[in-house]
């Protein structure tokens, strides 16, 4: 019925994570990092995920205090810029989404760090000059309510969503700019913009937040959503909600770059933390949190999850013209 299989419900038990001698890579930094005694991590991951990662690092390196600050992409960017203007950066490591990682790199706010773990990450999932590496990627899917959508009406392509049966029955995120740009990049500009305009004519329901959209689909407020992630629906399905999802080609893919602050207060601790996040054990933790790790020797769960999927990433050229695409999105979907 769909391209991917569902991931099983996750259970992360911190005390059962056994760390192997991967840390030999980090020996160069450990003494200096422990002397610094602290690392500050800015992230857009949800609080429970951030805590699982930082608690695991703290267990491995008890002499280093780990502090994390979780917020949205735009709020985090503003905080980083405010600190930079004041000449008092407080953060060491950042984990954000693709566009904001691009902005941080472009504005000179990231330091190059060629972690020894980066060799396990493919081109396209890391900056060629070492400024960031993506720790995991989230993939967009079409999620729907199984009580409201008959099997015959389950979409097999984006074009299927332009049929009369879907008019007024699709939810999209009110500021889904990366979904918009990645889908256009994947389809090709002319075809992509044509699809977006046709989708807007279907009178989609605009809401704030991918998790909320999935919840509204489960509640039957509308039949499906095009801008949520796989894990949004897996979580609901595990709780018994009448939902399912399919991957439509191209599937929006959002990298999650990890990078070191250009003026890190604790640079050695920051490097050690990045090594940990990119290590196989760190990536196994990412996988246990129902995310799809980007490290090549750490397959998703199940390993066949991405078979047949055509990912679409926003191109650097589009990022360079991102403001214009935001205006296009607002114009096409009537967002003020």
Predicted feature residues:
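Extracytoplasmic ligand-binding site segments that recognize negatively charged/polar headgroups
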Residues: 27, 40-54, 66-84, 89-221
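Short amphipathic alpha-helical coupling segments at ligand-binding clamshell hinges
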Residues: 53, 191, 195-198, 256, ...
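A ligand-binding cleft/hinge motif common to bilobed small-molecule-binding domains
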Residues: 98-103, 223-242
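Extracellular/periplasmic bilobal clamshell ligand-binding domains
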Residues: 300-336
